[in-house]
């Protein structure tokens, strides 16, 4: 099943929801980052949550989510655009947190204390920036807490990453359900009951159900209006010219020191791990 998301809204405007399968996306990002199993689950959850929240973007808008905690992975970062092009990174890919009999201790990897940062480029003069303390460090609950408390949209988020015994990611996906203003309380209550009874996302995906089937099961008997599908892919926006521009922002003295070493300067993209190398002459050309 190719990675994609399905976004729907009820005809009466009471609810909207997005379901996604992100298995290939999460696997591609975690392989590039070299994550251990627990870090893979933590990063995979944030990548999936970013894709879900990105379904609300339009045009050239972009979204970035960052989790900074006092755990061994230190920082998780994921970005997306309205086209479903996603990338992600982790500061320390080896969490050292072994899987337990019941699963993965993601809060131990992230840390119990920390913050969720949200940055939205909506095409305005300045990006929108939001921040909340981590609610549980499970990622899904942290995103739901942010959406409900900061954006004032009651939200439920479910995220899952399933690893085989050999560490291979065999299923990843998520679900975002939001209640809109002046929604019908009875309908919201019905959805809440169904969400409680819904099996884990990875169980549904491993049973062969895709985002559309998950949505149809959740909203059975409820008239739907808008219904959109978007492919999800890993894509990094870095480039050689972009890195040169970043180097140019360094101070003149620092650039002179780099150029004087008469050896190549290398910069590695934190997301895709592409290495960009520049000669001392190229560094000298950056000095005004």
Curated annotation (Swiss-Prot):
GO annotation, cellular component aspect: cytoplasm
Disulfide bond annotation, renumbered to this chain: 236-238, 269-272
GO molecular function: protein folding chaperone; unfolded protein binding
Alphabetical list of SUPFAM superfamilies matching this protein: Hsp33 domain, HSP33 redox switch-like
Domain of life: Bacteria
Keyword rRNA processing: no
NCBIfam families: PRK00114.1 (NF001033)
Alphabetic keyword roster: Chaperone, Cytoplasm, Disulfide bond, Redox-active center, Zinc
Keyword Metal-binding: no
Name of protein: 33 kDa chaperonin
Family affiliation: Belongs to the HSP33 family.
Species name: Syntrophotalea carbinolica (strain DSM 2380 / NBRC 103641 / GraBd1) (Pelobacter carbinolicus)
Cellular localisation: Cytoplasm
Biological process terms in GO annotation: protein refolding
Function statement: Redox regulated molecular chaperone. Protects both thermally unfolding and oxidatively damaged proteins from irreversible aggregation. Plays an important role in the bacterial defense system toward oxidative stress.
Post-translational modification: Under oxidizing conditions two disulfide bonds are formed involving the reactive cysteines. Under reducing conditions zinc is bound to the reactive cysteines and the protein is inactive.
Predominant place of localization: cytoplasm
């Amino acid at each position: 099943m190719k990675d994609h998301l399905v976004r729907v809204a009820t005809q009466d405007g009471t609810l909207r929801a997005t379901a996604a399968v992100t298995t290939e996306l999460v696997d591609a990002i975690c392989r590039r980052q070299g994550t251990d199993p627990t870090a893979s689950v933590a990063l995979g959850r944030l990548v999936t949550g970013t894709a879900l929240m990105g379904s609300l973007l339009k045009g050239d808008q972009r979204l970035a989510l960052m989790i900074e905690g006092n755990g061994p992975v230190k920082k998780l970062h994921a970005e997306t655009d309205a086209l479903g092009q996603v990338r992600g990174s982790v500061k320390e890919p080896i969490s050292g947190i072994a899987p337990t009999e019941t699963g993965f201790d993601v809060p131990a990897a992230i840390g119990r204390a920390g913050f969720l940062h949200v940055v939205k480029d909506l095409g305005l003069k300045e990006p929108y920036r939001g921040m909340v303390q981590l609610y549980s460090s499970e990622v899904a609950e942290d995103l739901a807490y942010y959406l409900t408390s900061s954006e004032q949209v009651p939200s439920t988020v479910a995220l899952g990453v399933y690893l085989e015994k050999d560490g291979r990611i065999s299923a990843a996906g998520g679900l975002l359900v939001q209640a809109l203003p002046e929604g019908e309380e009875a309908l919201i209550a019905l959805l809440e009951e169904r969400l409680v009874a819904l099996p884990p996302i990875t169980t549904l995906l491993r049973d062969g159900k895709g985002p559309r089937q998950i949505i149809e099961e959740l909203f059975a008997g409820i008239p739907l209006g808008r219904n959109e599908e978007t492919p999800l892919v890993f894509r990094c926006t870095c480039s050689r010219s972009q890195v040169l521009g970043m180097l140019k922002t360094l101070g003149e003295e620092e650039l002179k020191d780099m150029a004087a070493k008469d050896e190549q300067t290398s910069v590695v993209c934190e997301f895709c791990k592409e290495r960009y190398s520049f000669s001392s002459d190229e560094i000298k050309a950056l000095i005004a």
